[in-house]
From Swiss-Prot:
Database matches in PANTHER family: 40S RIBOSOMAL PROTEIN S3A
HAMAP family membership: Ribosomal_eS1_euk
GO molecular function terms listed in the Swiss-Prot or TrEMBL record: structural constituent of ribosome
GO cellular component term of the entry, any: extracellular matrix
A Pfam entry, by short name: Ribosomal_S3Ae
Keyword tags: Cytoplasm, Ribonucleoprotein, Ribosomal protein
Protein name: Small ribosomal subunit protein eS1
InterPro entries associated with the record: Ribosomal_eS1, Ribosomal_eS1_euk
Family: Belongs to the eukaryotic ribosomal protein eS1 family.
Signal sequence interval, chain numbering: none
Length: 273
């Protein structure tokens, strides 16, 4: 005889939308990544509201965001560069981030590979003057000389080693003698009048330095800083972080908390008839 199933309705708990417990913050990046420094917003991020001793800002610090450099600079020529930003401080409803790495898109890397040429790559671990420990990867390819008729452009092992040594020397010297902000300028160079320069428009980028000096050993092209990893970071300095946001829009946004103005209290005097 089959067991009779108990009749009765199953009552489940009322489903609550988890986003009702969250609030949205504006994610901002240093002004050096933008064509217009006043507009340094990269997006929004949700976080649970402050409850008791659990602060919303603690849940935001340390988050890593990946943003296309083309979107920030409004420049389609930089569409293959991806910038990583890490949340360092929270001011009102603004999340202030700093550089945390760079990478190339996979389709860009695949498009660089061609036959009849030699691929040369290297990486270095080096520390900036302000205490950031970086691992920088570089890549380049040999090419045919101007008067070369042979279709292949393979380089001998001795030439490859010489170019690789030159790449390591340039990366080590440039990164170790500058702070993180200047190093980023060398990484995200823009093209001005056909000459590759850094964001300030004065010095060649790291990739351009390697191309110029490496070509004296053997003709090379398609030189790129393939990846940058931030291995160690110093303690966050609020003053230095605020310098990265000079002339930005963060100061024009009202804070989340309403702050009143102090008013002097006047005592009323009573008279008896």
């Amino acid at each position: 005889m089959a067991d009779k199933k108990k009749k009765g309705s199953k009552k489940g708990g009322k489903k609550v939308d988890p986003f009702t417990r969250k609030e949205w913050y504006v994610v901002r990046a240093p002004t050096q990544f933008f064509k217009s420094p006043a507009d340094n917003k990269v997006g929004f991020t949700p976080v649970n509201r402050t409850q008791g001793t659990k602060l919303a800002s603690d849940g935001l610090k340390g988050r890593v965001y990946e943003v296309s450099l083309a979107d920030m600079k409004d420049d389609e020529s930089q569409v293959f560069r991806k910038i990583k930003l890490r949340a360092e401080e929270v001011e009102g409803r603004n999340v202030l981030t700093n550089f945390y790495g760079m990478d190339l898109t996979s389709d860009k890397l695949r498009s660089l590979i061609h036959k009849w040429s030699t691929l040369i790559e290297c990486f270095v671990d080096v520390k900036t003057t302000d205490g950031y420990f970086l691992r920088v990867f570089a890549i380049c390819f040999t090419k045919k000389g101007e008067s070369q008729k042979k279709k292949t452009s393979y380089a001998k092992t001795s030439r490859v080693k010489a170019i690789r040594k030159k790449m390591v020397d340039i990366l080590t010297e440039t990164v170790s003698s500058n702070d993180l902000k200047t190093v980023v300028d060398y990484l995200i160079g823009v093209s001005l009048n056909g000459v590759t320069t850094n964001a300030s428009g004065f010095a060649p980028t790291l990739a351009e330095k390697i191309r110029i000096e490496g070509s004296s050993i053997f003709p090379i092209h398609n030189v790129f800083i393939r990846k940058v990893k931030v291995l160690k970071t110093p303690k966050v300095d609020a003053a230095k972080l605020s310098e990265l946001y000079a002339s930005s829009a963060t100061s024009t946004i009202a804070p989340t908390e309403e702050v009143g103005t102090a008013v002097e209290r006047t005592e009323e005097t009573t008279t008896t008839a």
